[in-house]
């Protein structure tokens, strides 16, 4: 199994694989070569420079590492390419097992804008905001004024708490909008963002679901 991630999640995956007697491959950027997950894995491959776009989000480099090590499965961990339908599809096409959802389902729910659209189509209430991604800063600012501050700028491909900016005042908007787009590109390889009304100290219900080929359970 090649672990397409770093840090704590990569360490936890490697530890689980060791318990099952499964060989592991760690990938790393040039500055992560001495990281714990690299030292723990059976093999390691450098996939690029310290910028995530050049390493942990670099699909061609990851595919080369898979081929080089004859890996037959990939665990994406969380963040990075874990919700990238294109990566999952490329693995499927190359008969490499992706330890995660299918590319079809990632495409439906991994992209926050698409997920929100599907929720609305199925009659679920959603938070007030843009209908899709906003590219033009003028359009985005106009919509934010209509919704009313504070607002939240969110990366379409974001996850794990990354890719979000809270804007409390109109004069802060342009700066945060630009930062949100550049961070979305840096961390998720996609600079598309959308806007939602921000709620201070909200409560939400989260359901954890574990699914295999033939059954699914909720916790």
Model-derived regions: residue spans:
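N-terminal beta-alpha lobe that positions the nucleotide/phosphoryl donor
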Residues: 1-219
């Amino acid at each position: 199994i090649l672990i397409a991630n770093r840090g704590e999640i990569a360490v936890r995956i490697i530890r689980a694989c060791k318990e099952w007697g499964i060989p592991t491959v760690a990938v790393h950027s040039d500055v992560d070569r001495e990281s714990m997950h690299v030292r723990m894995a059976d093999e390691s491959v450098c996939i690029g420079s310290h910028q995530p776009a050049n390493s942990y989000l670099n699909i061609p480099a990851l595919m080369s590492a898979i081929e080089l090590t004859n890996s037959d499965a990939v665990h994406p961990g969380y963040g990075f390419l874990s919700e990238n339908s294109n990566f999952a599809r490329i693995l499927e096409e190359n008969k490499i097992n992706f330890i995660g959802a299918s590319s079809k389902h990632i495409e439906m729910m991994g992209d926050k804008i698409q997920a929100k659209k599907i929720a609305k189509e199925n009659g679920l209430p959603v938070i007030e905001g843009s209908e899709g991604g906003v590219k033009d800063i003028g359009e985005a600012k106009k919509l934010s004024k209509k919704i009313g501050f504070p607002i939240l700028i969110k990366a379409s491909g974001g996850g794990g708490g990354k890719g979000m900016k809270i804007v409390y005042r109109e004069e802060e908007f342009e700066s945060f909008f630009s930062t949100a787009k550049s961070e979305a590109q840096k961390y998720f390889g996609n600079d598309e963002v959308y806007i939602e009304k921000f709620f201070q100290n909200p409560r939400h219900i989260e359901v954890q679901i574990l699914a295999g080929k033939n059954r699914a359970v909720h916790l």
